[in-house]
């Protein structure tokens, strides 16, 4: 007798081994029809998989997050089915699930075109309409090799070669004549795959190495139903309208070019936006007791060997040689800050010591991973490091947590999720040290009543970290600030203080950043606000425009008065109709446009319009200045 325990605690008894689908059918026909897979003792399995022992079972449907993930994975296999029918000579590589979608890498002699993508999508729809069952067969490794040899699937054979010798059988999933290997699970029938869409085609490389052959990557998305798919498409369209690259060009903020991959050319308006953020964060430094420092961008490789970066991070570093010495462009600011700390003797009474830097760093990101100013090779961080005793860690983490939340809210982010990234496989130090570091972060968050999610394996090589994930205006989540506890780097780089017993000890080092990469943060701000920055943040806060040449001198006077007050203002004295000027500056998303006609000139006033088209009427210049100041501008 086999006992199956369901999530509500009820039990069902079966005389013989049963599949997940059998259990679902015993509960009801409706549930059986909705069943995608099962979770047996916490492990996801196919609906056809047999349970031969007492177990707990949760039926997975499209209402479950796991169910949607399975739909996406099976949609990737469906891409393979359609592609092989249309283009039999291509070779299939891999088709994993990604955030909100999937992709499939394919080797093809010629690049796929948008017309190809439309044809593939059409064929996928036709295959779904056939409402066929997806059949799973657990197949011996040797037989799998013969199957793929017969089909000429060279990349599948390479993937099998990479597998451990312990794997002697694998799941083969059949979509009619098409077959793919996978650990699964997958949907039992194509009727679950109706809410899908292919989104784009890009290039990729075998194993992600640019030295290897190029592949075609077909991206797509899939959801539980058409309503969810339509909501996603609408969200993507909104994201495209907010794309920082588009707005950056429209508003003349920055540009990128081929001669400097992953490096940003900031234009005057973009640099004005940068300066607003930097000066704001500089005030945060001062308010919270950080001394601002400036360290070299290039350091001898010996320092990176001592710090541990050489063993754990060198693939992401840029190197150069001079006078038979090897130097590295810094990928992080922390070793430099330790050098500042090491100049002079410190007592426990001096701690905590806090350093902050707008440090320019460089990381050799793969070219395929670069994306506008959100993913770059050269970036500046609002980086800070705190040198403290173990007893001071909790208070410092608490203070940072509170200041980080205040900053995010000031920039317009109200939904914030906190996560702790735990020890990675490749790391410095022993487990006892990591236990202590992870415990310190948990304790600090717990004492503040903060709920958090844990991310095993995602910490830095030198310590665990708190991560701050912010939700933007259209529901996307961005990881920004971090707070990391590091018990190791101070010892590796010789940082010491004298304790109350006159003994030398290594301080604890806290690595912290609130906005992180300035480039990335500005890209996120552009998309979050859709280029419509609040007045205090906008690169140009006010444009003063004349109606005729008769008001030119008064426009210049108003512009100068505002500029002298510290506002970012420009004058538009072009010989254009005022309607044209209003339309242009509205499209540029300037918060305020001051229109100057004869009446305003005579009365020493300004006619105020907002970028939303609201006419605030005529007011004195002083009244307008007070309005700006009330908005924090």
Curated annotation (Swiss-Prot):
GO MF term (any one): threonine-tRNA ligase activity
**How is the cofactor bound, in the record's words?**
Binds 1 zinc ion per subunit.
One of the protein's GO biological processes: threonyl-tRNA aminoacylation
Q: Which UniProt keywords apply?
A: Aminoacyl-tRNA synthetase, ATP-binding, Cytoplasm, Ligase, Metal-binding, Nucleotide-binding, Protein biosynthesis, RNA-binding, tRNA-binding, Zinc
Q: Name one Pfam family in it.
A: tRNA-synt_2b
Give the first-level EC class, as a single word: ligase
The TGS domain is annotated at 1-61
Any idea where this protein resides? Cytoplasm
What are the required cofactors? Zn(2+)
User: Binding positions for Zn(2+)?
Assistant: 334, 385, 511
GO cellular component assignments: cytosol
Q: Which domain of life is it from?
A: Bacteria
Show the SUPFAM superfamilies listed in the entry.
Answer: Class II aaRS ABD-related (SSF52954), Class II aaRS and biotin synthetases (SSF55681), TGS-like (SSF81271), ThrRS/AlaRS common domain (SSF55186)
Q: Name the segments for region: Catalytic.
A: 243-534
The EC code for this enzyme is 6.1.1.3
The answer on whether this UniProt entry bears the keyword rRNA processing reads no
CDD domains membership: TGS_ThrRS, ThrRS_anticodon, ThrRS_core
Task: Name the reaction it catalyses.
Answer: tRNA(Thr) + L-threonine + ATP = L-threonyl-tRNA(Thr) + AMP + diphosphate + H(+)
Family of this protein = Belongs to the class-II aminoacyl-tRNA synthetase family.
What's this protein's function?
Answer: Catalyzes the attachment of threonine to tRNA(Thr) in a two-step reaction: L-threonine is first activated by ATP to form Thr-AMP and then transferred to the acceptor end of tRNA(Thr). Also edits incorrectly charged L-seryl-tRNA(Thr).
Assembly: Homodimer.
Would you tell me the protein name for this molecule?
A: Threonine--tRNA ligase
Q: Which organism is it from?
A: Stenotrophomonas maltophilia (strain R551-3)
Tell me what gene encodes this. Answer: thrS
